[in-house]
Amino acid sequence: MNRNIAVVGLGYVGLPVAVTFGNKHKVIGFDINESRIKELKNNYDRTNEVTENKLKNTNIEYTSNAEDLKKADFIIIAVPTPIDKHNKPDLLPLLKASETVGKVITPDTIVVYESTVYPGATEEECVPVLEKYSGLVCGKDFFVGYSPERINPGDKVHTFETITKVVSGQTLEVLEIVADVYSSVVTAGVHKASSIKVAEAAKVIENTQRDVNIALMNELAIIFDKLDIDTNEVLKASGTKWNFLNFKPGLVGGHCIGVDPYYLTHKAQEVGHHPEVILAGRRINDNMAKYIASNVIKELLKQGLEVQGATVNVLGLTFKENCPDLRNTKVIHIIEELKEYGLNVTVNDVEADKNEAKKFFGLDLIDTKELKMVDVVLFAVPHKDYMENKKDYINLVKDCGIVFDIKGIINSDELNVSQRLWRL
């Protein structure tokens, strides 16, 4: 492999990609956030995806100067692809990154997109921007490929190197080059998709499939709750069959699973098909925070406790366990609902950045040692600390109080006799 690599976007996805390539090659790491560049130069990653030691031992030239990208002939773009308030794809970060690259791209460069998009977006949306700002012709002067990111934030087992990499290119020759570049660092190997659209579609259905399956579990949990059946016990029993899929109910947030299905449904509607199952799954999952909050109220009443002024400790704010990422977390909706009912809510998160919680949600996160006795403790996110010290947090629930368990980590025998357990 004889390519000069650059990675555009050094967040949860781009940084692990850059660091992994930097272990074997010299890499240019570009981000428009100058404070992020400064932190990385000081071997600090606020996402906790890459350790200080790994940052020290990788060969990356960090920069916020786009001119430095001229030194690269293999540019990987890994920027966020969110949705807007109407649940429509927001391609602005991707198009701005394409504009940045287009202004500095040199002939014979290959641009590979890793950002999750709907099928066709790379060639229909990104390529015209690259051509406009470069004055070059795609397929003649420069080329594109697509290799969807599969990073799982907080997961130290399934990493960039150990997950099979789907790769694609606009020609067979480009495909081979893209495969060769990624094969140099991805030990799990690569899968050569037959086209860029196939690779785009493969990525977007990975998370759509998961979203729909979790929605099914959430609907079952709602049904079983009305039937007074323990969902966890049902899943244990069903799980004894070899082909039963191991999905569990819960909140669906973050920048992938709760977002990507809308990219696919957008494209489906654009070509004249109204997707029913996918959108039904989205509705179920988006309503779970309201469902959980309403059950807090019901359980307080069952216990004979006053709703107005009832006290709650919410444990966990991030969108998933053992990860500081607050993007698109659904826990905030539970908190907002409880406050609307007049409850006094205290929020603790052992992983989240306090400044970001304040910036994004106006929340003041409380240190663990400052948590007080309350009517309700709600285990929202199963961070390692909460798992290992469950009893300490349960002991903060008053007699006749309630423990709410969103992820099925608490057993009834862990509670005091007068306390009540509600599990999703």
UniProtKB/Swiss-Prot annotation:
* Keywords for the protein's UniProt record, in alphabetical order: Capsule biogenesis/degradation, Exopolysaccharide synthesis, NAD, Oxidoreductase
- Single GO biological process annotation from the record: capsule polysaccharide biosynthetic process
InterPro entries, per this entry?
6-PGluconate_DH-like_C_sf, NAD(P)-bd_dom_sf, UDP-Glc/GDP-Man, UDP-Glc/GDP-Man_DH_C, UDP-Glc/GDP-Man_DH_C_sf, UDP-Glc/GDP-Man_DH_dimer, UDP-Glc/GDP-Man_DH_N, UDP_ManNAc/GlcNAc_DH
Per the record's keyword annotation, is Ribonucleoprotein included, yes or no? no
Note the SMART domains from the entry.
UDPG_MGDP_dh_C
Task: Tell me one Pfam family matched here.
Answer: UDPG_MGDP_dh_N
Q: What does this protein do?
A: Required for the biosynthesis of type 1 capsular polysaccharide.
Family that this chain belongs to = Belongs to the UDP-glucose/GDP-mannose dehydrogenase family.
Please identify the protein, giving its name as recorded. Answer: Protein CapL
The top of its lineage is: Bacteria, Bacillati, Bacillota, Bacilli, Bacillales
